[in-house]
Amino acid sequence: MVIIRLARGGAKKTPFYSVVVADSRNRRDGRFIERVGFYNPLAKEGQEGLRLNNERIAHWRDNGAQLSDTVARLVKQAQKSA
């Protein structure tokens, strides 16, 4: 099954997440198909904390990809702020 989820990056105690399309059998930070955005939970004021490519997310959802709970929340948040 293909899933759209967060892959953790960044240094210790400073998380940075990539929003990726991956096979659910692969590790969280492992191999992925496509990177469709990023999420920075520690973004300072004036910095971009969330960027999603909604066209590509819609494309993958139409082709059967599932959203993780956190990514679904972020997509809803991005649509509300846009």
UniProtKB/Swiss-Prot annotation:
<comment type="similarity">
    <text>Belongs to the bacterial ribosomal protein bS16 family.</text>
</comment>
<keyword id="KW-0689">Ribosomal protein</keyword>
<dbReference type="InterPro" id="IPR023803">
    <property type="entry name" value="Ribosomal_bS16_dom_sf"/>
</dbReference>
<protein>
    <recommendedName>
        <fullName>Small ribosomal subunit protein bS16</fullName>
    </recommendedName>
</protein>
<dbReference type="GO" id="GO:0006412">
    <property type="term" value="P:translation"/>
</dbReference>
<dbReference type="GO" id="GO:0015935">
    <property type="term" value="C:small ribosomal subunit"/>
</dbReference>
<dbReference type="GO" id="GO:0003735">
    <property type="term" value="F:structural constituent of ribosome"/>
</dbReference>
<dbReference type="GO" id="GO:0005737">
    <property type="term" value="C:cytoplasm"/>
</dbReference>
<keyword id="KW-0687">Ribonucleoprotein</keyword>
<dbReference type="InterPro" id="IPR000307">
    <property type="entry name" value="Ribosomal_bS16"/>
</dbReference>
<dbReference type="Pfam" id="PF00886">
    <property type="entry name" value="Ribosomal_S16"/>
</dbReference>
<dbReference type="InterPro" id="IPR020592">
    <property type="entry name" value="Ribosomal_bS16_CS"/>
</dbReference>
